[in-house]
Amino acid sequence: QLIDDEAYAQSAVRYCAARLMGRRGAVRELVRKGVDRGLAQHVCDEAEAEGVFSEAAWELGRRTARKTVGMDRDVRKRRFWSAGGRKGHNPDILRQIAQELFG
């Protein structure tokens, strides 16, 4: 039985978003799983247009904010930026979220 590559890629993108990954992280994960890079980028572009990765970044920010309550503001920001970078989020959206959540 042949697997529809695009359906698999879309399913994998939803999985990546549930793990709060960004676009870069999702493309990297799809390619690692054997999806063609062009298809991976196409599916991630569609998901990005739907706001999937933006919402994942906001959820990552909210979780980081909850976990770091009471810590120094710079420490909280650094932890958020580190997590966002590891998960492959766009620095522009990370900057916006950090500004709003951590001042």
Model-based region annotation:
Residues 1-103:
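An alpha-helical, amphipathic repeat domain used for nucleic-acid recognition
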